[in-house]
């Protein structure tokens, strides 16, 4: 695959009961830290082109087209967030990646949080870009109270 005018990533696939997930990787060695980029809803792997170009040669890189997005289409819509996290784990196992740093944008951040919840010992780090926390313990009672009383902004 060509990104930022440089051939950086190898395209691979991962089969699920709902369809095929397409992902791209650049694996330097299994001892190198791996960055996993997860784009948000309606975005595809190209969202992270600049980051991939910057980190190439310094880190292992994996980026996917999320289930039912771009190259990962067609895809049956009978899955949930935790299925996505399990499939991500399957991809990481297939690539023999241990302790990645997951970088998720919007919906990709939710997948990263679900992965962290299911596999806390298999994660080196998590970076969220425009994703709200999934777990209640990250939101204060005051924030919940305020959110329930806000007028719609539309």
Which residues does each predicted region cover?
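Flexible "cap/lid" loop of the alpha/beta hydrolase fold
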Residues: 113-118, 124-154
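N-terminal cap/lid segment of alpha/beta-hydrolase-fold proteins
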Residues: 2-20
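Gly/Ala-rich beta-loop-alpha elbow adjacent to hydrolase catalytic centers
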Residues: 104-108, 112
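Short, well-ordered alpha-helices that flank and scaffold nucleotide-derived cofactor binding pockets
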Residues: 50-53, 57, 90, 117-121
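Active-site micro-motifs of SAM-dependent methyltransferase domains
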Residues: 43, 68, 109, 133-134
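Active-site loop/oxyanion-hole signature of alpha/beta-hydrolase fold enzymes
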Residues: 16-18, 24, 62-103, 118
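Structural signature of beta-strand start/N-cap positions in the alpha/beta core
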Residues: 34, 60, 98-101, 122-125
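Conserved HGGG/HGGXW glycine-rich cap/lid loop of the alpha/beta-hydrolase fold
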Residues: 19-74
